[in-house]
Amino acid sequence: METNGIKLTPRDIVSKLNEYIVGQDDAKRKVAIALRNRYRRSLLTEEEKQEVAPKNILMIGPTGVGKTEIARRMARLVGAPFIKVEATKFTEVGYVGRDVESMVRDLVDVAVRLVKDQKKALVQDEAQDKANEKLVKLLVPSMKKKANNNTNSNNPLESLFGGSIPNFGQNNDDEEETPTDEVKTKRSEIKQQLLNGQLEDEKVRLKVEQDPAAMGMLGTNQNQQMQDMMNQLMPKKKVEREVPVKTARKILTDEFADELIDQETANQEAIELAEQMGIIFIDEIDKVATNNQNSGQDVSRQGVQRDILPILEGSMVQTKYGTVNTEHMLFIGAGAFHVSKPSDLIPELQGRFPIRVELESLSVEDFVRILTEPKLSLIKQYEALLQTEQVTVKFTDEAIKRLAEIAFQVNQDTDNIGARRLHTILEKMLEDLSFEAPSMPNAVVDITPQYVDDKLKSISTNKDLSAFIL
C-alpha cells in the first residue's frame, strides 16, 4: 500500500498538524520525529531494521487539550492504520471482558479496510461498469434458467463422505436464458437512460449479503473470534431488498470491486501495513496505574499492565487474517495523571514509553485561536451549517474573545474538559438561532459580545447551572 505521507519531514508534519491543532508544539515535534524515524527505518538493511524498534510515546495532560487529535491526524497524514482504545476497558487474562490482544485485532481490521479501499479505488471504473450492466438486467429482466434440481437436492454432508460438493456460492437466480432481440433493444435504451442519470430514483429488487453482525453473538472476545470463524466457513446469506437505482449501484459496485481484487493478497498487505505502520493510542492509561491506596483494585490494574507489556515488547497475535507481529507498531499512551503519576506504572511498562511529553492546559488565547485558526474551525463550521438555510452569521472578534473567556471560566469553575467546552458553549449560544433558521431566509445575524452575554451570561455566572448545562 502506498504511504507517501511518511516521506514528510518533521517540519512538514508539524506544519500540517498546525492546520488543525492549536498549540502543543512540543507534542507535535515528538510525534513528528517518531513518524520520521519510521521512514528512516524503512531505508535500512533488513538486519538493521530488526534491531530498530519504534520509541513509544507517553502523553500527559488533561482531557480536551489535543492528545488524541494529534495522534489521529498524524496517522491520517501517512495513511497509517490507527485505533484508539481505553486501558480501562481491558481486563486481566482469565476474567470476563476484553483481553489486550483485541486491540491488535482491531488494528488489523482497520488496516484491511484501508488496503481494500485503496485496491477498490483502482478497479472502481470496471466495477461500476459491471454494476450498470447488472442494473440494466434488473430493470429489463429476461427469462430465468430453470434451476438444476439435482444440485439443489444435494445433502451438504455428502461432501464429507466422498459425494459431490454443493456449490453454495453460486446464485442460480442470476442465470438467464439468451435475451430476445426485443429485450436487447429495450436494454440498450435503458442503459442510455441509466448512464444519463435519468433512472436514479427508480426502484429495483436486489439480493444483498446480510451483515453477519446482525446475526452474531454478543459477549466475550472468545465468542467474537468464534463468530468470525463461523462467518468465514458458512455461505453468506443474502436477503432481497427494494432500493433506488443510485443505492443499488453503490451496493453492486462494492460487490464487484470485492470480486475484482485479490482478497488474500490484500489481507497479507494489510498485515504488513499494520506491523510496520500501525499506531495504537492507549487512552486513560493513568487509570490502570497503581498508587497503593486500594490494594484490591491494584492487583487487577497491575494485571492489565502486565498483559499490555508483551504487546508493547513485541509478540505474535493470532487474527482472522493471520499472525501479526507487534514488535514494530507504534504505541502512544495518554492520560491526565491527576491522581496517579507516570511513576505509578509498573517499571517495565514505564520503560516501554521512553518519550514523555506534557501537554499544556488551554488558556483564553488558545481558545480564541481554536475558534478561528484551524482549517475548519468551530466558527467556520457553524457559519457553513447555517448558510445552508440562507442565514449568514458573522462573529465579531470581540464576541469570539468573550466566548473564549466564558469557556475558560466554566472550565475553571467546574470540570476542565479543555477545548470540548467550546462545543457546548457554541451549541447553547446558537440553540435559538439554529431552531428558527429555516423560517428566516436571507437573514444576517451579527454575533457581538452583547449577543453572547444575553445567551450565556446568566448560565456561565451560576456555577450550579453551568455544571449541568455547559
From Swiss-Prot:
Q: Where in the cell is it found?
A: Cytoplasm
Keyword list, A-Z: ATP-binding, Chaperone, Cytoplasm, Nucleotide-binding
| Cellular component GO terms held in the UniProt record | HslUV protease complex
Q: Does the keyword RNA-binding apply?
A: no
Query: What family is reported?
Result: Belongs to the ClpX chaperone family. HslU subfamily.
Q: How does it assemble?
A: A double ring-shaped homohexamer of HslV is capped on each side by a ring-shaped HslU homohexamer. The assembly of the HslU/HslV complex is dependent on binding of ATP.
Matches recorded under NCBIfam families: hslU, PRK05201.1
- Descriptive protein name: ATP-dependent protease ATPase subunit HslU
